[in-house]
Amino acid sequence: MIVLDTHVLVWADADDHKLGRKARILIDRLWPLGQVTVSAISFWEIGMLQARRRLRLPVSVAEWRDALLSAGVVELPLDGAMAVRALDLAGLHDDPADRFIAATALLHGAALVTADDRLLDWGGALKRYDARE
């Protein structure tokens, strides 16, 4: 199972060239198996980016989310265990969405697919794939 970082979800949906060949193959292989997941916090993060005009979706965040879930992306909900785990990620930067996404991957035993160098370089015990490869 893999957890897509927010920007990777956007790239995968848009078939963006920023998504590397290896990452695309991994996503395409796991998608039909129901093993491509996303933290629920990613939809909040997308909404915040859209509100700040840093991202434009052709539809509302709710419609975009529904379309992705209908297409087979699995949403992993937030819960108290994740909130506590997100607090306990020594050395990880303070971005709350990144902390929740990392905690989600850790608690589900999943690998994180990201292009965020801060997450890729973090020393924690999280399996990661560089989405640019």
Task: Spell out what each predicted region is.
Residues A12-D13, K18-L19, D79, P96, ...:
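Hydrophobic/basic alpha-helical segments enriched in Actinobacteria
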Residues L49:
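ABC-type ATPase nucleotide-binding domain
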Residues R56-P58, A62, L69-D117, Y129:
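Active-site neighborhoods of divalent-metal-dependent phosphate/nucleic-acid chemistry enzymes
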Residues M1-V38, R52-D66, S70, H108, ...:
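Short, well-structured N-terminal submotif of metal-dependent ribonuclease cores
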